[in-house]
Amino acid sequence: EDTMKLRTVGLGLAAAGAIALGGAALAQNVPEQFVVSGKAAEKIQDFTTINLATAERIANSCEKAATAEGVQISVMVLDNDGNHVYMDRMDGQGYLNIITADMKARTALMNRSPSKLVMNRVIEDPTRELQQMQLGQFANSGGLPIVVNKQLIGAVGVGGSAPHPPVWSDEICAHKALTEVIGPSVPPLEKDLPPRANPTPGEAPVPRFVAATPPKTTLPADFVVGGKGAGNVFDGNQISLAAAKRVARVCRDWAASKDGTMSLYIIDNAGEFVHMERMDGQVYNNIHTAMLKAQTSLKTRQPTSVANAQLKNNPNGIARTTTYFNLFTNSGGIPIVVDGQMIGAIGVGGGAGGGDENCAIEGLKATFGDHVTLPVYPAAGGSPRG
């Protein structure tokens, strides 16, 4: 019996060693410049998932290419578990552009292949689209898997620009970005199939819907979407991508200075994603709560710390309210109110080393200065806020 126990222990140690060696091999297979590494990778038990730096470079490269073409895009980068890692919505983009970027990335991730292949299958046989939809796949080009040294580390999806292949398309934008960031190992694009012609086209008149004058705003131009972008969404008071990225950068640096990490979402005043990022070592709960905080602060028009304090001071009715109306009461969500005008909301999750709300405040102060409204707590010994 003792011999059997020793043999079992020996086999267990051998298996553990094999797992450790396997993890080390995976870690060595993908250069650290592209994936979460070190203690952050040990924390999430994954040495093969895309890091924030790579995701940010891919998004920025795609946006630069789109700007050169005179178009706007939305770009979403996922890790190999399907979590959001980095997201940007260029000014003037709307809901459909944003959500399809996410859908394309998820389709590429699920199939480990370009989302165009799903589109091509549907073009060849339209009866297959229902099955693809039932599987949660989106039959459109613009989603590509992110593969380094034959290891899937994530996926990217781009939406929002009118396709004009072979000159320009969402997929071309994503491919250019991957080639610039990952290198020449990125495979060439799949062939484009011509769309199937409608045998019985209709002749219904299509109305135009264009405002005669661009929307007006009293806010500084640096803070909000302007020009043609504002005209596209009929709103001159949406937070701009540039302002959102400044807020996020300060929050990220502040968290790092506290030896912490965070996940962050910034949404516009319609509740649509503008910018998102997940620092290395963050997991699903951190990411998802950041989104919930931003959405809650937008819906309630107040920081999530208000309900958090109320829950501690007098919980009567709070559970009912939060459940019925899908609110989240942890601190870290703040509506972005500039010169009295709400232009969006921010949500921070994951701790940030010194508190999620504090991280959000640092980003807002650095970006908007005295223009922004921030939560103010009573002095020690004063009446607690209701």
Predicted region positions:
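Gram-negative bacterial Sec-dependent N-terminal signal peptides
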Residues: 4-27
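Flexible, solvent-exposed loop/hinge segments and secondary-structure transition points
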Residues: 28-386
